[in-house]
């Protein structure tokens, strides 16, 4: 509710507003109408799951263990939902621990790797969005279409809002 108010959405109106809150451990998709919560769908995935997937992919690809905070920093610095190799691929260097030698090893985490980590979770969020939209009354559909916001740390990933709102 606070996110909708902070975004200046018309929560007291009867037409409906939607807030997609991508938290650390879960994503809440909330429909607000007439100043109250009309419906909510919780998807059990969030930013922490993406960070853990980045750690896993770096270990698989480079045979290097990185810390969860390095994964989160890389996600926020170079992360995006879709990445075209020639135009969008950004990268960041991270020092991890070689799983082979147990020594420090520098790896490059790029936007492509982060996009690969994000995709399975994006699909779960989109599935949750589709579930709540199926339950949505026709009277609220236009308001939700016109008055929606995504919030939370991972909502700052490039392309995530476009991907979510393309589904509406």
What residue ranges belong to the model's regions?
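Short acidic, glycine/serine/threonine-rich loops at helix termini
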Residues: 6-9, 30-33, 41, 55, ...
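Short flexible coil/turn linkers enriched for glycine and charged/polar residues
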Residues: 11, 22-26, 34-36, 142, ...
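Phosphate-binding glycine-rich/basic clefts of nucleotide- and phosphate-handling proteins
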Residues: 33-119
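Glycine-rich phosphate-binding loops at beta-strand->alpha-helix junctions
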Residues: 142-164
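A short acidic Gly-Thr/Ser loop motif
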Residues: 19-26, 32-36, 46-48, 152-154
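Phosphate/ATP-binding catalytic cores across multiple sugar-kinase/actin-like superfamilies
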Residues: 10, 117-144
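Conserved phosphate-binding catalytic cores of ATP/NTP-utilizing and phosphoryl-transfer enzymes
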Residues: 1-20
């Amino acid at each position: 509710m606070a996110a909708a108010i902070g975004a200046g959405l018309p929560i007291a109106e009867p037409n409906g507003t939607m807030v997609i809150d991508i938290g650390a451990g879960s994503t809440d998709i909330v429909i607000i109408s007439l100043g109250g919560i009309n419906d909510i769908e919780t998807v059990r995935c969030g930013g922490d799951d993406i960070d853990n997937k980045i750690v896993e992919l770096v270990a698989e690809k480079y045979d290097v263990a990185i810390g969860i905070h390095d994964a989160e920093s890389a996600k926020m610095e170079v992360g995006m939902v879709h990445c075209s190799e020639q135009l969008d691929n950004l990268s960041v260097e991270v020092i991890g621990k070689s799983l082979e030698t147990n020594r420090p090893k520098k790896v490059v985490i790029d936007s492509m790797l982060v996009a690969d980590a994000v995709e399975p979770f994006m699909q779960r969020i989109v599935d949750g969005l589709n579930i709540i939209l199926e339950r949505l009354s026709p009277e609220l559909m236009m308001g939700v279409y016109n008055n929606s916001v995504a919030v939370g740390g991972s909502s700052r990933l490039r392309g995530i809002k476009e991907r979510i709102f393309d589904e509406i």
